[in-house]
C-alpha cells in the first residue's frame, strides 16, 4: 500500500513538472518592452551591407520585425522560463556607429537581464560609455574587431559577474584600470592589438580564476607584476610585442596549468628562470626578440609536453642544451641569432617529432650531425652563419624524406658535396653558399631536386663552370637562383631555346666573370630581381631590359658599361604599362654623356644610384618636373655634372647625394619642402650660398654635408633636433658661434635620454619596409686624409667645422653633446679657452682643434674621456699642465707642438719617445711620424665604425629576399654596449 502511494506521488510530480515546462514553452516568451528596446538599439546604428564579411549570408537583424517573437530573432536568446532577453549577439552584423551613454541598451531597464553582449566584428567607433555598468548581470562582453577608442572605463570593475572579456583589435588606449581586480570571476581577458600603455596593475593578481591573459601588440611597459604568480589557474599567458622590461618573474614557475607562454618582442633581461622547468603542461614557450642572457636551463628537459621552443634573437650563450633531447614532442626549435657555442649533439634524432630546427647566426662549430637527416618529420633545417666545419654528410637518408628547407650557407664546410643530397627530392629551398668544395662540382646531382624553388650555390670555390642554360632547363619550379662568386657561362652551347628555360623571379650572378649581357634574360618575363654586378660586361645596356614587365630591381654596378640603348625614350606605346622598375644601381661603370632621360619614364623608381661614373652635363630637368611619390634615394656622386640643382626635386626623397661634381649656384630653396629628407650631401662642388638655415624645418634631417664648396657668411643658432652628422668644412663660413649654438641638437645629447629604444623603432625602421638596403656613404676629412664611410651609421655622430674662418670661443653648449664621436674645429680662428664642458663628451673618439688661436689650459676633464683615441691641439697658444690620462699619453708629440706654454710629465713622456719637444715647431716632422699619424687616425675611425653596434642606414627596400652582400652589414661594438636592432 505504502509502495503504491509513493509511486503515485512520484507520477503526480512528474506530470506537474511536464505541464509547467509545456506551458513555459508554449507561452509568448518575449516581453514587448524588451522587443522594442532591442529594435531601438538596432536603429541607433547604420547598416552597411556593402562592407559585410559575406554578402551571401543574411544579416541577423533581417529577422527582427515588430510582429514576431524576439526570442526567435537571430542573435537573441531568452531565458526559457521567464522570457527575458539574456543574450544579444550582433557579431558580423555590418553595423557602424557610436555606442552612446544614453543608448537604449543602458537606459531601458528591460535589458538589465543581459548576460552576454557580443558586438564583435563590426564598425563601432568611439569610447565605451561608463553606463555599461548598468548591465550588472553580464558574464560575457565581446567588443573585439571594431574601431573603439579611448580608455576602458573604471566602472567596468562593477560588472562583478564577468567571466569573459575580449576588447582585442580596436584602438583603445590608456592604462588597464586597477578596478579590473574586482572581477573575481573572470576567466578570459583579451586586450591584444590595441594602443594600451602603462604598467600592468598588480591587482590583476586578484583574478584567481583567470585562465587566459592576452595583452599582445600594445605599448605596455615596466616590469611584470609579481602578482602574476598568484594566477594558479592560468593556462595561456600572451604578452608579446610590448615594451616590458626587467626579469621574467620566477614565480611563473608556480603556475602548473600553463600551456602557452609568449613574451616575444619585449625588452626582458636576465636569465630564463630555472623554475619554468616545473611547468609540466607547457606546450609552447616563445621568448624571441628580447635581451635574455645565460644558458637555456637544464630544467627544460622536464617539459615533456613542449611542442614549440622559440628563443631566437636574444643573447643566450653556452652550448646546445643536451636536456632538450628529452623533449620527444618538440616540433619547433628556434635558436636563431644568439651566442651559442660548441658542437651540435650527434644524437639529434632523439627529437623524433622535430619539424623545424633553426640555429642560424650562432657560433656552433664541428660537423653537422647526420642524425638530423634521420628524423622523418623534419621539414626545415637552417644553420646559416655559424662556424660548422668538416665535410657535409647526410647519413642514411631514407628513400623518402620530408625535408623541404635546407640552409647551410656561410659556414666552414669543405670537401665534395655528397651525391646523397640528390635523395632530398622534396627540397624547395637549398642554400650551400660559401661551401669550400675545393675543386670540381658535379652540378647534375642537383638535377634530381625537381621541387626546388630557391637555390643558392654562391661562392662554392669551385673551378667548374656553371652552364646557365643547363641550370634553367633542369628545374621547372625554380623561382630564385644565386650563383654569385662562381664562374658562370651565359652562352647557349646547346640546342635549347629560351622558351624551354624556367621563368624565374630572382637571379643573382654577381662576380661570375660574365663578359657580355646575358641574352636569355630577354625571355624572362617574370623576372623581378636581377643582379649582374661585379662582372666584366662591356658595351651598352640593352633597351629591352626595361621592357621586362615586372622587373623592379636591377644591379649593374661594377662593370664596364659605357651607355644605354634608347637613352632618351623607351618608346612606350599608349597602351603599354610603364616599367615597374623600383631600384636601379649603375655605380662604378664607365657611363658617359648626359644622364639618360628615360629615367623620367620610370614612375615607380625609389632608388637610383649612378655614382662613380663619367656622366656630364646638367641633371635632367625632367627629374625636377616629375612629382614621383616613390623616389627616396638619389645618388649622383662622383660624376662630372655641372649646372644647377633642379629647383623642384622629388618631394619624397630621403637621401640626396650629389657630392663630387661641378654643380654651381645656390641650394634650391625647394629642398625645405622635402619633409622626409634625412641625408643631404653636396660636398666637393662649386655651390656658393649662405648657410641653409632654412633646412631647420626638415624634422627628419640627420646628415648634412656641405664640405668643400664656396659657402660663406656667419651661422646663427640652428634647430637641427635630429642632426647626427654635419660636415661644413672647407668653406668660407665666418663669424662667432653663439654660446647656445648646440642647445637644440638633441639627437647628440644622449641616445638613452632622447630615444625610446625599447620598441626598436629607430632610424632604420623609418625607411625600411622589407629586406633590400640602400647604403648612403660620406667622406670624412682629417689632416688632409679622406676616408669614405660606405655606410652611414645611426650611432656615428660627427661635427666637422674645420677649414673655415670662425672666430671667438668654442660654444660652451658643446658639452651637451654626450653622444658626439668626432669633433673637428681645426683651421679656423677660434680663440679663448677650451670649454671645460667638453669633459662631458664621454663618447668622443676624435678631437681636432689645431691651427686656431686657443689659449689657456687644456681642461683636465678631457683626461677622463676613455674613448678619446685621437687628438690634436697643435698650433695654438695653450699653456699649463697637460692632462695625465692614458689617452693623452698615447698621442704623438706633434699633436701638441707650437704651444710653448704646455708642460708636465705626460708631455715629457710623449716627446721623449720621439726625441723632441713640442716647442720644436720649426722642424719638419719626419715622414715616418706623418705616416704613423695618418695610420693612427685611419685606424681610430675604421676601428670605431667596425666596432659600432648595428649600423642603421637610410634605406629603400622592395623585396623579402636579401642578397648575401647585404645580409650582415654591421658588427657589434665590443667596447660599448649599444643596443642592436632585431633581425
Swiss-Prot record:
Residues 959-983 are cytoplasmic. It comes from Arabidopsis thaliana (Mouse-ear cress). Belongs to the RLP family. SMART domains: LRR_TYP (SM00369). Residues 1-25 form the signal peptide. It is found in: Cell membrane. InterPro entries: Leu-rich_rpt (IPR001611), Leu-rich_rpt_typical-subtyp (IPR003591), LRR_dom_sf (IPR032675), LRR_N_plant-typ (IPR013210), LRR_R13L4/SHOC2-like (IPR055414), StomDev_PlantInt_Reg (IPR052941). The keyword Nucleus does not apply. LRR repeats lie at residues 82-108, 111-135, 136-159, 161-183, 184-207, 209-231, 232-255, 256-281, 283-302, 303-327, 328-351, 353-375, 376-399, 401-424, 425-448, 450-474, 475-498, 501-524, 525-548, 550-571, 578-602, 603-628, 629-652, 654-674, 675-700, 702-720, 721-744, 793-817, 818-840, 841-865, 867-890. The keyword Repeat applies. It is a single-pass type I membrane protein. Its main location: membrane. The lineage of its organism: Eukaryota, Viridiplantae, Streptophyta, Embryophyta, Tracheophyta. Keywords: Cell membrane, Glycoprotein, Leucine-rich repeat, Membrane, Receptor, Repeat, Signal, Transmembrane, Transmembrane helix. Pfam families: LRR_1, LRR_14, LRRNT_2. The chain crosses the membrane at residues 938-958. This is Receptor-like protein 19. Residues 26-937 are extracellular.
